[in-house]
């Protein structure tokens, strides 16, 4: 196995995860709640660790199917391990195991939760919690492929490991470009839902939360009784 290239790609994935936390940080700043530093610290950790992993020298820059499976398997584990940090650092979910459960449930769009009082969490963390549904709905590694420059057969091995179904190599010649097209469609459908919910009278913040969770099919809400709280 090409361990150097596996670590380099995982490093890129961690940096992408740090970028994904930026909207949640902005929400925390807007509402001036106590989760601001939790996101800043987590993003710094992700960037430093990701950069160090990316800087590992690799003589052979090619990898094969088993390397792709390793990247996907370890990638899902790493984004969940680091994605749980804002909950723990902020003190909103003191137990790391509970925070990890919540994050894994988000990224895998399972929808299970250990939270009894969802509304007690600060808005930035609730935003991140639902955003994990949106990211996981398309696939964490597919997002990485969408932002990476074309890498030929290497991206094909990652896509094969990430996506079930027909052989993607027989469907599309350029995996990275196809990932971008998929995300454009995903974002477009999400925007349509945002518009419809706003027309229906839902506040913007709540609209984004429920769009992320329903588009990703995870079902997380910022209300204890989910959409039933709106009585509409």
PLM features per residue range, with description:
Residues 1-232:
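Membrane-proximal intracellular helices of multi-pass ion channels
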